[in-house]
A protein has these predicted regions:
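Hydrophobic alpha-helical transmembrane bundles of multi-pass membrane proteins
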Residues: 1-219, 227-233, 237-247
Length: 248
């Protein structure tokens, strides 16, 4: 398992998405009418409870607060409520977001167990929570507000048809395209490149850690310890390099 290189930036990105989602859901209404306050409240509540329940899942599974679950939780709540944000009560939004957070956290654990890479947690957040959000329309939506004259069971069947048809089109269409591309240009890097990091292996962009590793490797091969490790008081690797130079 590779740890994220910058958790604070990832968390900031999630907060920016959260803020932007108010405009996304509110703007999708198409008019500045009485639905807007309900949409904004439901969006906020679902994201908040997605954060709470996903974080709780991280604590239960890993026995400690896990940043990944805290970052994906509110996003899962946002995805879950998007389809029904204008047609459910705030109490329903809490339930939808809570279940979305649990589904997202469970999917993260499942993907790690079956060893499927998903570096941006798109499957837990957008696929799993998106499916749940689509189903939630039939379970919690106010059909009178929606103008739907179906039973909940009938609407649930319609939602499932939509999930299956759109999901099949996207999966098989993407699979065929990527399979063809992969035949000419392999999409996955090798194990060494993956461990080294794509910034270095593909873009030749060095990092403090990589520079420190290069010095240590060179010293081990040449047994010449006159080469100094990079020093920087503002990075972990630079601080280690400073102390290493003192030691040597």
């Amino acid at each position: 398992t590779f740890q994220g290189s910058n958790t604070p930036i990832a968390a900031l990105g999630a907060l920016i998405l959260w803020f932007g989602w108010f405009g996304f859901n509110g703007g999708a209404n198409g008019a500045m009418d009485i639905k807007i306050p309900l949409i904004l409240i439901n969006t906020f509540l679902s994201a908040s409870f997605g954060l709470i329940f996903s974080s709780m899942m991280g604590i239960l599974v890993l026995k400690k607060p896990e940043p990944l679950f805290m970052i994906t939780g509110p996003l899962a709540g946002l995805v879950s409520i998007t389809a029904s944000c204008a047609y459910v009560d705030p109490s329903d939004a809490i339930v939808i977001g809570s279940i979305g957070g649990i589904i997202s956290g469970s999917t993260i654990v499942l993907l790690e167990k079956i060893k499927i890479d998903d570096v941006v947690s798109a499957i837990p957040v957008h696929l799993a929570s998106g499916i749940w959000g689509t189903i939630a329309v039939a379970l919690f939506g106010n059909f009178e507000m929606m103008g739907v004259e179906k039973t909940r069971l009938e609407q649930l069947f319609i939602q499932l048809i939509g999930i299956g048809s759109i999901g099949s089109f996207c999966f098989f269409g993407s699979y065929i395209i990527f399979k063809i591309i992969n035949s000419f240009f392999p999409l996955r890097v090798g194990k060494i490149e993956e461990e080294l990091g794509l910034n270095i292996s593909e873009h030749n962009a060095s990092t403090d850690t990589h520079e420190l590793l290069e010095v240590l490797t060179k010293q081990a091969k040449s047994e010449d310890y006159s080469n100094r490790a990079p020093q920087d008081p503002f990075t972990d690797s630079g601080i280690i390099g400073t102390q290493y130079n003192v030691l040597m």
